[in-house]
Amino acid sequence: MGVWHGRSLRKPTGGRIRPHRKKRKFEMGNPPTETLVGEERKLKERRGMGGNVKKGLKFATHANVADPETGEVKCVRIEEVVKNPASQYYERHGVITKGAIIRTEIGLAKVTNRPGQEPVVNAVLIKEEEEEG
């Protein structure tokens, strides 16, 4: 079933609002793209306003991790999702969102972008003590 972002057909009191027109395509929405750690990188494409194509990341294998001390950015393999403050469900199922802490080849990193809306995972390297505290 589709997601609809139009106005509710009920008033706050529970009374009915009679629609003056049908639902329009531009009022349609999409379920969120929940990015997972996978064996192969996979994108999810969806239609945007004006026929544009929005790309989200469905499965991620690598992340661009920036080291704040040296200023270097490395493309490293993602091993697992350690913590996700967005939701316990996301943490349990290993969903990558902005703010999630992931374990990479070079250490723990905090995700700084929204991979469900951008086809890449960007992160900043953090110290082991910061994550535990």
Curated annotation (Swiss-Prot):
CDD domains: Ribosomal_S8e (cd11382). Keywords: Ribonucleoprotein, Ribosomal protein. InterPro entries: Ribosomal_eS8, Ribosomal_eS8_CS, Ribosomal_protein_eS8_arc, Ribosomal_Se8/biogenesis_NSA2. It comes from the Archaea. GO terms for cellular component: ribonucleoprotein complex; ribosome. The keyword Oxidoreductase does not apply. Part of the 30S ribosomal subunit. HAMAP family: Ribosomal_eS8 (MF_00029). This is Small ribosomal subunit protein eS8. It comes from Methanopyrus kandleri (strain AV19 / DSM 6324 / JCM 9639 / NBRC 100938).
